[in-house]
Amino acid sequence: MNVRDVMKSFHIQDTLNKKVWEEDKTLNKNVRKILLKVSQKFIKDWNIDKKVKIQDIRFTGSLAAYNWSKYSDIDLHIIVQYKDLNKDLNLVARFFTLMKAYWNIKHDIKIDGYEIEVYVEDVSEKHTATGLYSVLEDKWIKEPEPTDAVFDEDDVMTKSKYFFNLYNDILLKKYKEGKYSEVIQVIEKTKEKIRKMRSSGLARGGEFSTENLVFKVLRRTDLLGKMNDLITKSTDKKLSETKKM
């Protein structure tokens, strides 16, 4: 997928997505029903003894705004209070990250071609989203407004190319040379760098910050997926070497 082709998807639409939203900008009843069922199933799969109060179930991301495209997915956030589960909030966050990954491996649920991405979020986490809808309450928390998509295309291109070059010229080379530990280490550091970069961009410049758009380019061109695959392959190679010893 060409980077410039992906960037064309960042333009603003005239309306919210009509497959998801009604004319009065409320969530389509069937869509809401599916999202509630998906949430209930996901929560059930946690399989934890302690009863967790669900604070809210929220729909956010580009499909809850005017910058949706064919690349969009449905970001479904289940809001809980982490400290209700454990005082170690980092432990709780890691648990839910693993649950999300496990869920995505097991399930491939889509609504009109749009994949549902389920997340668990602490109630204290701040939102920078353009649009935020409570699926539980069936109302907008923050209703989006159409706005001009102003961003520095050249800057997005330059920063995106850095990560493509890192993957093609360094990571693949190290993998072919059998430097599997280095591959894993570099990718883990790179993923953390991308995560921090996106968070700071959203906080400072919102949806159309260079950092957030770079993240979208990396995701929509599947570079992030390729990095994850390379971690898996490198880990398998390391384990195979251990067995031979």
PLM features per residue range, with description:
Residues R4-S72, V80-M245:
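Catalytic core of pol beta-like nucleotidyltransferases
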